[in-house]
């Protein structure tokens, strides 16, 4: 396993618990005589810290390990910044569910120490890439580790769009939107929308309709290399939004085309040794664990 020499730290902002965990982590890493860099935004919640400060592009170039202290949202933001770079990501959970940030705050020294000694599992997660075209001109692009969603925004009104997969017409739909999710995102918003749980190793994408105005529209699982194309219908009375991971969004206009494909970029995600996807599902989703009669 790769050894780590330069470690970047990113923390969830406006969180006292994150501050506490970051201070513990910094003390532990400096005791190990490792070079530690602090994310520029994160430095605002640690004003007394004397670590070198770096922007995320600078962290991507200088570090071989990024440790994110926060929730899944913090890790999603880091994923888009560091995917495609030769840097690995480790998460410490200071959020709510913590599907991606799977080290407990109580185990920081123990579990991070195991990772530093080479005892960890490495996964390569693919991201989705969205491209918005208007009159054959690229208006915006976006990356998502979890999902790309087309939706009406703040207004409680249905939108209408056409769906094509690999240039084949699938349907024209009126609904509250559509979730296009990676396997990583299948335990997030897509799950709430009634989509299936997909193992992270699957090379697949799931499309989950949001409250479709039909009784027969169900989630569709397609191959990971599929090209998904959405056409915003002309008769929409609003401007649907396209959102990546619930964190970045762009506004569409009637007649726009949105392409969603698998990105060439990969996220190198680290888990502690012994990590088990199904155990994570049991603990995070409240599945029964009793196997006796």
Swiss-Prot record:
Identify the EC number(s).
2.7.1.23
Which Gene3D superfamilies does the entry link to? Answer: Probable inorganic polyphosphate/atp-NAD kinase, domain 1, Probable inorganic polyphosphate/atp-NAD kinase, domain 2
Q: Where in the cell is it found?
A: Cytoplasm
Where is this chain primarily localised? cytoplasm
Provide the active-site residues from the annotation: 72
Give cofactor(s), names only: a divalent metal cation
Give the protein family. Answer: Belongs to the NAD kinase family.
Summarizing the function annotation, the protein's role is: Involved in the regulation of the intracellular balance of NAD and NADP, and is a key enzyme in the biosynthesis of NADP. Catalyzes specifically the phosphorylation on 2'-hydroxyl of the adenosine moiety of NAD to yield NADP.
Q: What is this protein called?
A: NAD kinase
- Organism, by scientific name, is Teredinibacter turnerae (strain ATCC 39867 / T7901)
């Amino acid at each position: 396993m790769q050894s780590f020499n330069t470690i970047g730290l990113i923390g969830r902002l406006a969180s006292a618990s994150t501050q506490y965990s970051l201070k513990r982590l910094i003390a532990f890493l400096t005791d190990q005589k490792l070079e530690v860099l602090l994310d520029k935004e994160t430095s605002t919640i640690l004003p007394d810290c004397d670590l070198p400060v770096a922007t995320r592009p600078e962290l991507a170039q200088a570090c071989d390990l990024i440790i994110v202290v926060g929730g899944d949202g913090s890790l999603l933001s880091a994923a888009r910044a560091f995917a495609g770079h030769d840097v690995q990501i480790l998460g410490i959970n200071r959020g709510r569910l913590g599907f991606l940030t799977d080290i407990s705050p109580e185990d920081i020294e123990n579990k991070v120490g195991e990772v530093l000694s080479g005892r960890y599992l490495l996964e390569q997660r693919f991201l989705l890439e969205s491209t918005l075209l208007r009159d054959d001109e690229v208006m915006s692009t976006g990356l998502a580790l979890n999902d790309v969603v087309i939706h009406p925004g703040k207004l409680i009104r249905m939108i209408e769009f056409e769906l094509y997969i690999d240039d084949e017409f699938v349907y024209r739909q009126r609904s509250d939107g559509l979730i296009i999710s990676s396997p990583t995102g299948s335990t997030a918003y897509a799950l709430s929308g009634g989509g299936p749980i997909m193992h992270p190793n699957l090379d697949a994408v799931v499309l989950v309709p949001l409250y479709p105005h039909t009784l027969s529209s169900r989630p569709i699982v397609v191959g990971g290399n599929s090209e998904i194309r959405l056409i915003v219908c002309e008769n929409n009375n609003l401007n649907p939004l396209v959102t990546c991971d619930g964190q970045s969004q762009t506004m569409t206009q009637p007649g726009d085309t949105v392409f969603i494909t698998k990105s060439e970029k990969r996220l190198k995600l680290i888990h502690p040794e012994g990590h088990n996807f199904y155990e994570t599902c049991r603990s995070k989703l409240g599945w029964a664990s009793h196997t006796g009669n």
